[in-house]
């Protein structure tokens, strides 16, 4: 009976050890994949179109603001037949960024008071 119990404990220990190593391998693969995605994002970010510049050549090339990506907005100017596209920030996202900035400042003040 003791040998069966000892064998069971040994089996569970080996199984948990092999599972832990497999999870470490998966975690390492996820970290490598994440790093490669970040490198690609940094490379892509260098070629973005700034706010209020023409984005008609690539409508997905607008730069990111502090929290959100700007949107390529196209319109026809008054009295013109040519379509004009520029990178702009939608108003609702602008207000959300302002609110987030104020909340961040307020959080800093609270931290200073109680920190």
Swiss-Prot record:
It is found in: Secreted. One of its GO terms (molecular function) is toxin activity. Disulfide bonds join 48-63, 55-72, 62-87, 74-85. The presence of a 'disulfide through disulfide knot' structurally defines this protein as a knottin. Pfam families: Toxin_35 (PF10530). This is U3-lycotoxin-Ls1k. Residues 1-20 form the signal peptide. The lineage of its organism: Eukaryota, Metazoa, Ecdysozoa, Arthropoda, Chelicerata. GO terms for cellular component: extracellular region. Keywords: Disulfide bond, Knottin, Secreted, Signal, Toxin. Its main location: secreted. Residues 21-44 form a propeptide. Expressed by the venom gland. PROSITE patterns: SPIDER_CSTX. Belongs to the neurotoxin 19 (CSTX) family. 01 subfamily.
